[in-house]
């Protein structure tokens, strides 16, 4: 596909991904990575998504800051940062098709757990945050999809919509900023990546603003359904792409 076609598709994808991120507090990478890797390699797509994700989560974090509970989630953020460099190593050395299947499989597995109503109240959150954060960081570094483990954990703990969204974007902002040095060191932030990131930026901004506005009017039950639908569709698309079916 030529550059112009990639940009046109990218504008549509980034707008929709921005809407989802603004609405739910997550989903930017879950929506954009599976589709964009059909047209660009993961080694180009994932750094582009990272640069956009940093901007949008910071904006959402400012809007949702009053619901953030740093005392609760700081162990999660530290564990995520520790896992992230290992994920970056996987991104550099794994084949594109392998990464796509890995991305999709992780998403689908976690979504099925949510659909099955998997729930087990965990009293010692700080201890549980260590493995959850590390796995999330590993996935974030390799696929920019570190959300599913944390989303499942927060859902399991019964957080309401506003707290769920605020703590999630706070975690993502921290992890995304920590990922930048590893990507630079790995040679993943190239001139081509920056070019695409700049060209697609307006669509992401418009989508993010739209999503933030929708977040104030969408009811809790509809919010949860949207989350599950996004997860399952994105996961299946990524697997299909990895096997050459998409």
Language model features by range: what are they?
Residues 7-74, 147-205:
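Small-residue-rich hydrophobic segments that form or flank transmembrane alpha-helices
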